[in-house]
From Swiss-Prot:
A GO cellular component entry from the record: cytoplasm
Radical SAM core domain sequence ranges: 111-344
Misc remark: Reaction proceeds by a ping-pong mechanism involving intermediate methylation of a conserved cysteine residue.
Protein name: Probable dual-specificity RNA methyltransferase RlmN
Reactions performed catalytically: adenosine(2503) in 23S rRNA + 2 reduced [2Fe-2S]-[ferredoxin] + 2 S-adenosyl-L-methionine = 2-methyladenosine(2503) in 23S rRNA + 5'-deoxyadenosine + L-methionine + 2 oxidized [2Fe-2S]-[ferredoxin] + S-adenosyl-L-homocysteine; adenosine(37) in tRNA + 2 reduced [2Fe-2S]-[ferredoxin] + 2 S-adenosyl-L-methionine = 2-methyladenosine(37) in tRNA + 5'-deoxyadenosine + L-methionine + 2 oxidized [2Fe-2S]-[ferredoxin] + S-adenosyl-L-homocysteine
PANTHER family xref list: 23S RRNA METHYLTRANSFERASE, RADICAL SAM CORE DOMAIN-CONTAINING PROTEIN
UniProt-listed PROSITE patterns: RADICAL_SAM
Active-site residues from the entry: E105, C349
Cystine residue pairs: C118-C349
Family affiliation: Belongs to the radical SAM superfamily. RlmN family.
Gene: rlmN
Function of the molecule: Specifically methylates position 2 of adenine 2503 in 23S rRNA and position 2 of adenine 37 in tRNAs.
Residues binding [4Fe-4S] cluster: C125, C129, C132
An annotated GO BP: rRNA base methylation
């Protein structure tokens, strides 16, 4: 019998590129190289993203020769579901295993306006935010575009059973999306394309901890994707404590990049602000935040943080959250408190993966 380690080594040795990593024009280019008509790309995408088949033999309108070429050249990436947790509010958290044995998290959230999915872009994270479970263990590797796409496909397969669909997505799972920029953009274009999963650009949101050079680059992209900054503090001292990335990309430089993005795109930006008891949740912190954002076309999303056992932070009391919100509103800031979901499962980003890793080391 093969051990898990041997299977993983075998997978690494035999791995082919993921077909989910190809954008439509890249599929057309590959078909041309194979002497095949480029219209076949649309048929292949239909099988992958509309019918969601798991093997090439099911692509019945393709000649066997083409199916064999596809099979010899590309893997249809499938993710092994290790854990599936369902919350009382309908939130579902998936722990998926990748071909090399690493695991990642994906979350399905149910809203009145539809189903939203939160995807992961890296195995682990290098950013080191002191409140986050995702960074425990550091960064292992970037996900390929196809591995990010496969998360959406797998969740959509789960929704097929109840004839539902993924209608929006947020790139706010494990990892820093802008540290995996090229694969991130390929993923977004694949899921946005009408022949792909076809999620509208305005129904997608990318969040960053503040990689300043990539904010300027993202401002030049030709997609109207929503953009969010994980801010969590409006002064340098507190933000550097919560988010060490602030030492590399200072708050004034971050705000300059934000203003460039807003002016270049005309789009409103969202600032995510997690409230940590006794750290950044007092009235004076709200006043600092309002001053920092004055004149910026933005929205603030206040986040009552989920408890992470490996971290020391505590939740801000409910009445303090409302006072913080009121302080911002009184100063003209557009603000909402994020609705809590998945509170009765391992809801914090990276928490389920950290729990699984801990079990494996026992």
């Amino acid at each position: 019998m093969e051990t898990t380690v041997k299977k993983q080594k075998k997978n690494l040795e035999t791995k082919k590129p993921s077909i989910y990593s190809l954008q439509l024009h890249e599929m057309q280019d590959w078909l041309k190289e194979q002497g095949e008509p480029k219209f076949r790309a649309g048929q292949i995408f239909d099988w992958l993203y509309k019918k969601r088949v798991k093997n090439y033999e099911d692509m019945s309108n393709l000649a066997k020769g083409l199916r064999d070429k596809l099979s010899n050249s590309f893997d249809i990436t499938t993710l092994n579901t290790l854990v599936k947790q369902t919350s009382s509010d309908g939130t579902i958290k998936f722990l998926f295993q990748l071909y090399d044995g690493y695991s990642i998290e994906t979350v399905l959230m149910r809203h009145e306006y539809g189903n939203s999915i939160c995807v992961t872009t890296q195995v682990g994270c290098r950013i080191g935010c002191t409140f986050c479970a995702s960074t425990l263990g550091g960064l292992k590797r970037n996900l390929e575009a196809g591995e990010i796409v496969a998360q959406v496909v797998e969740v959509q397969r789960a929704l097929d059973e109840t004839e539902e669909r993924v209608s929006s997505l947020v790139v706010m799972g494990i990892g820093e999306p802008f540290d995996n920029y090229d694969n991130l953009m390929s993923f977004l274009r694949i899921v946005n394309h009408e022949k792909g999963i076809h999620i509208g650009a305005r129904h997608m949101t990318v969040s960053t901890s503040g990689i300043v050079p990539k904010i300027y680059k993202f401002a030049e992209e030709d997609m109207q994707i929503n953009f969010a900054i994980s801010l969590h503090a409006a002064n340098t001292e507190i933000r550097s404590k919560l988010m060490p990335i602030n030492r590399a990309y200072k708050l004034p430089d971050l705000m300059e990049a934000v203003k460039y993005y807003v002016n270049r795109t005309g789009r409103r930006i969202t600032f995510e602000y997690g409230l940590f008891g006794g750290e950044n949740d007092q009235v004076e912190h709200a006043e600092e935040l309002a001053a920092l954002l004055k004149g910026v076309k933005c929205h603030v999303n206040l986040i009552p943080v989920n408890y992470v056992p490996e971290r020391d932070y505590v939740r801000t009391p409910r009445e303090q959250i409302f006072l913080f919100e009121k302080t911002l509103k009184d100063r003209g800031v557009n603000v909402t408190i994020r609705r809590e979901q998945g509170h009765d499962i391992d809801a914090a980003c990276g928490q389920l993966r950290a729990k699984e890793r801990k079990e494996e080391t026992r």
